[in-house]
């Protein structure tokens, strides 16, 4: 058996940079490695959107939430994937589904599994990080 340092030295001594490249049709590129970075001319995704089914909100509206003292917010609207919601008013949340655009004013999504809902009011018992469960415009 050889040491880690010796194994690393052997690997590095045998590794050679790839200097030859070729241009091939995309359909034949499976299993290949790009020779240089490519950049999309458009943002993917094209807008901030939800990564989960849940509730879009402003973190500042539930900053004091805890297990002992949950913060309750009314549901102002329902935003399905492919639909655009209106601006989120302070002190409210929006029911949002995976892929749906984040409404203006919201900065975070809380998954439906992490809340309790009674009628049109949702109880939040923890404060997420700003940007949680949000796929940002251009992040891909």
Language model features with spans:
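Short, low-complexity N-terminal leaders and the immediately following helix N-cap/first helix
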Residues: 1-67
């Amino acid at each position: 058996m050889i040491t880690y340092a010796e194994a690393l030295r052997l690997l590095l001594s045998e590794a050679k940079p790839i200097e030859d490249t070729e241009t091939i049709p995309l359909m034949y590129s499976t299993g290949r490695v790009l020779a240089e970075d490519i950049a999309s001319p458009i943002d993917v995704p094209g807008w901030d959107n939800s990564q989960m089914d849940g509730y879009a909100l402003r973190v500042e509206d539930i900053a004091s939430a805890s297990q002992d003292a949950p913060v309750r917010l009314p549901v102002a609207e329902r935003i399905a994937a492919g639909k655009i919601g209106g601006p989120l008013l302070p002190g409210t949340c929006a029911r949002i589904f995976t892929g749906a655009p984040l409404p203006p004013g919201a900065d975070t999504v809380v998954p439906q599994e992490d809340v309790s809902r009674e009628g049109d009011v949702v109880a939040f018992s923890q404060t997420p990080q700003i940007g949680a469960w949000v796929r940002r415009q251009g992040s891909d």
